[in-house]
Regions:
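Generic structural signal for well-ordered, non-transmembrane alpha-helical segments
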Residues: 23, 248-251, 287, 291-294, ...
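C-terminal helix-coil-helix/basic helical segment that borders enzyme active sites and/or dimer interfaces
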Residues: 34-37, 295-334, 348-351
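Glycine-rich flavin
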Residues: 44-51, 57-159
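Charge-rich, acidic-biased intrinsically disordered regions
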Residues: 47-48, 270-278, 309-328, 353-371, ...
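Glycine-rich phosphate/pyrophosphate-binding beta-alpha loops
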Residues: 153-157, 238-242, 375
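A short core secondary-structure module
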Residues: 153-190
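Glycine-rich beta->alpha junctions and the first turn(s) of the following alpha-helix
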Residues: 197-294
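Glycine-rich phosphate/cofactor-binding loops in nucleotide/flavin-utilizing enzymes
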Residues: 349-401
Length: 401
């Protein structure tokens, strides 16, 4: 009697009470991800799916009406959604990052106002924060500030309700203001000019500001962006998000490659087997990729746990502890990047030439990872780790620290 073989799940899919929602959203996103990757543009229907899912308020504390989910759980969700659709995972993750910005920089009254509205009005946040783009100028005026200029890499600005905006006020990395502005504010123009080879639907194009007024109460703080080691954890969240997007793409690529090899790949004539899955070289390569990815995931989980512990320390977090977390996160990111670049390329060695047909879109995993690994040079991450090991000097926590 024939039996159906049991294939164990390659990766854990436990998100506690949120498991049904996360898997439902991931399944829906995966169904059209390859087609939408080719189209680019703004994924309006999929953004609405995220709105309707209730997942946009995960990082909002329960005191403001949110779920108050722990960061390691949120990061695992980013990974799982990136497995299905890297662009929408990016938007989901950046939503949580903007919420964290309000928690880290905002006054109690600002937190109550903007996080309460995030829940009550189901806000989708965008950003115009890119620290390296200093073309956005700010001048003091009565009762606030005037913004003129442009910001690039403004992920999620399209179709957003509110923007987290940063402006440079001086030469030091700490000379920055963070502002919260409605996307529809007079003078703000969100441009549909994102057309990169990967992360095709993150809407990471430019936002222009023409004599945009920002009232004093719309500037986050006190405490502000440079008030304590805790405040610099925003940058750490950004680094972890990149790590999880790498890992999610690698997971998606490996799962698709295994499925394709089982069902469609033709064995190589010299392998001496009737099925590709019986080719010992393909078995070897697949086992190596799986082990590489599992090791990278384990390191990421360790870093995420350390981050949660740092987050919970609040203002008691000191510079040394912040540096240790930063180095662990850097180790996770560099390891995940190497693993993901390797896996998203090597899957074609399993599947063969037919798998390069454009309709499959298997190359999107590599393109997504390649774009995101260029966010800031990984060699400098490794250099910082080496310097820290030799001298105990922690990374600069500002900018990309």
């Amino acid at each position: 009697m024939a039996t159906t073989p049991y294939f164990p799940p390659l990766f854990a899919e436990d998100f506690g009470a949120f498991t049904p929602t996360v898997l439902s959203v991931a399944t829906a996103l995966a169904a059209t991800a390859a087609v939408r990757d080719k189209a680019g543009g703004t994924a309006l229907a999929e953004r609405q799916l995220l709105r309707d899912s209730g997942l946009l308020t995960l990082a909002v504390p329960q005191a403001f009406g949110g779920q108050g989910a722990a960061w390691p759980l949120i990061f695992r969700m980013v990974r799982r959604l990136a497995q299905a659709d890297s662009s929408l995972a990016h938007l989901f993750a950046f939503q949580q990052l903007q919420v964290a910005s309000v928690l880290l920089f905002g006054s109690p009254a600002q937190q109550d106002r903007w996080l309460g509205a995030t829940v009550g009005q189901n806000w989708f946040w965008g950003n115009a924060v890119n620290a390296r783009d200093t073309r956005l100028q700010v001048t003091r005026t009565e009762g606030g500030w005037l913004l003129d200029g442009i910001k690039a890499f403004c992920s999620g600005a399209q179709d957003s309700d509110v923007l987290n905006v940063s402006v440079t006020t001086g030469p030091e990395p700490t000379d920055r203001l963070y502002l919260v502005l409605p996307t529809g504010r007079t003078g703000i123009q969100v441009n549909a000019d994102w057309d990169n080879m990967g992360q095709r639907q993150t809407d990471s194009g430019t936002v222009e500001f023409r004599q945009v007024f920002a009232a004093d109460h719309e500037v986050l703080g006190p405490p502000g962006a440079a008030s304590s080691p805790r405040a610099t954890l925003r940058n750490t969240i950004g680094q972890i998000i990149l790590t999880e997007i790498y890992l999610g793409n690698a997971q998606g690529a490996l799962i698709e490659a295994i499925d394709y090899t089982r069902t469609q790949a033709q064995p190589w004539v010299m392998a001496g087997v009737d099925r590709s899955v019986d080719d010992p070289l393909l078995q070897l390569r697949t086992g190596e990729m799986w082990a590489t990815l599992r090791a990278a995931v384990a390191l990421a989980e360790e870093a995420n746990t350390a981050f949660q512990q740092a987050w919970e320390q609040g203002l008691d977090l000191n510079e040394t502890q912040r540096g240790e977390v930063g180095m662990l996160v850097a180790a996770a990111r560099t390891t995940a990047a190497k693993a993901a670049l390797q896996i998203t390329s090597q899957i074609f060695e399993l599947m063969g030439a037919r798998a390069t047909t454009a309709r499959y879109g298997f190359d999107r995993y590599w393109r997504n990872v390649r774009v995101h690994t260029l966010h800031d040079p990984l060699d400098y991450r490794s250099k910082e780790m080496g310097r820290w090991l030799f001298t105990a000097e922690p990374p600069n926590p500002y900018g990309y620290g």
